[in-house]
Amino acid sequence: MSGCTVRAARAGDEPGAYHVCLKTGNHGQDGAQLYRDDPDALGRIFVGPYLTLEPELSLVLDDDQGICGYALGALDSRAFYARYESEWRPRLCAAFAEPHGDPTRW
């Protein structure tokens, strides 16, 4: 890992961090085959909230090819979850249509 740098996450890091999330999203293995229709899905669910709601506790690992890792945290898990539910989740849900048809067939 020569030439790697740990730094505070900043605006614009989402695509790189989401990509890392996808590439490790199948039990640590590449999840790209599972999320072909929406490669950013895992990142929007698991990475985006921290980058947005807890930026001061969001770090990324950079190398010469871009973001290759991250460490994310929340100072207060209960407060973070409350903000996730009131701020992040509604935006996420609003971006996608409700499924149609018989719910037993989803």
Regions flagged by a language model, labelled:
Residues 60, 66-75:
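Conserved beta-strand in the GNAT
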Residues 77-106:
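Conserved acyl-donor/pantetheine-binding loop and adjacent beta-alpha core of acyl/acetyltransferases
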Residues 19-36, 49-50, 79:
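Helix-loop element at the rim of GNAT/NAT acetyltransferase active sites that forms part
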Residues 36-58:
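Active-site rim helix/loop that mediates acceptor-substrate recognition in acyltransferases
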Residues 11-12, 64-66:
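Short strand-connecting beta-turns/loops that link adjacent beta-strands
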Residues 5-19, 75:
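A short beta-loop-alpha structural element at the N-terminal edge
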